[in-house]
Amino acid sequence: MTKLWVNFFSQKLLRLLIPSIIVVFAFAALFAIYSPIQLGGINFYKRTNLFTVEELGEKELELSKTVTIDIYRKAMCMDDLEQSRKCTTFGLDPPISAHLFYTYNRDTGMNRVARQWNRRIPRVFHTIKGSNFIELSQFTAFEVELRVSHPNWAFVSWSHDDLNELVDKSYHNLHNAWSQLSREAKDQWGFLLGLYEYGGVWMSRSLQLKKNIDKFVYAAELSVKQFTENITSSTVEEFQPIFMAPKSLQYDFMIATPKHPFVLSLINELCKSEVLLKILSKRPYHGLDAAEALFAENRESITIREQEFFVNTYIDDGKVFVKNNPHIIFIPTEAFASTWDFLPSEESSEMCFADSPLFDPDYCISHSSKPDGNELAIYWSNSFDLITA
């Protein structure tokens, strides 16, 4: 009889323990893929292995291949676009007017757009034209290559008048500061303001993408989705904003979801910056350490029940929600090259910049930094933690 009772309770205990065992193994598998990292008090998670064909899908991997374009057909397309005509060779319409883009999205309400693109990147390229350096036909060649290799993306061109309209309508508090900026500085501010307002991909015309980026964008979205689905606790609210950039954060290439908190921190940092306006548009950030420093500079803390939390905190139904740091992804520098190249005395970066219209794109590409195999590293921390009040 005793043996029967022991067997009975053993079976009951085993049934009770099975769900816990499964949960333990699930979390063990999760953290085997996503290893925790702490930098300056900020908790990140890094994906330690790349996505497989089964996870990404053959379609996304196929899109990442370099597209070869016939030089003569490219020249014909360049001529059409420079004359604001449709490029029938590749079926490319002239760039969308930023005024029309702004008007349409303002009418639809950007808060709704932000919700629609939750955990996703809007498939739109934005570029700012009309800077005071010479507009080169080579930049149009870069545009043709970009658009042919990304057929499902929209392409929006912003002028300084468009940026002025954006500030007047959406950023009244920055109007006075904006009016005092140089054209170069307006490019930089407009870059960040537009990135925050609309999300998508913002890039300099002088930057040449060497690879299709659908794979990187999709991998980021998939990683966020997988991580969120594995966190079953009711203490985590499901919103993981995505920010993507080269390993050295540049104002020449950034990707983000709309209303991204890290982009807002960059804007705040610029507003407080004492850098001379003439060099304001040439101030790159270098890697994750600089990003972490920005977090530290742009946040204040509060104390709840002897625990310190940051200023992005709100109370709902007697519960305290604390907003932590956003999702940051660094993409391989080999995915793009630029036409710029700082002089040795200037601040340099992993990307290739040139402060002159005289450059050799092939030389730039061939001398761009080589990847070390760790660039496709995905970092994040949970966006919201719930604390019972």
Curated annotation (Swiss-Prot):
InterPro entries, A to Z: Glycosyltransferase_domain (IPR051706)
Report which gene this protein is encoded by: pvg2
Keyword Transcription regulation (UniProt): no
**GO cellular component term of the entry, any:** endoplasmic reticulum membrane
Annotated protein name in UniProt: Pyruvylated Gal-beta-1,3-epitope synthesis protein 2
User: Where are the membrane-spanning stretches?
Assistant: 17-37
Chain ranges on the Lumenal side, renumbered to this chain:
38-389
Q: Which UniProt keywords apply?
A: Cell wall biogenesis/degradation, Endoplasmic reticulum, Golgi apparatus, Meiosis, Membrane, Signal-anchor, Transmembrane, Transmembrane helix
Example GO biological process? meiotic cell cycle
Q: Which residues lie on this side of the membrane: Cytoplasmic?
A: 1-16
**What is its membrane topology?**
Single-pass type II membrane protein
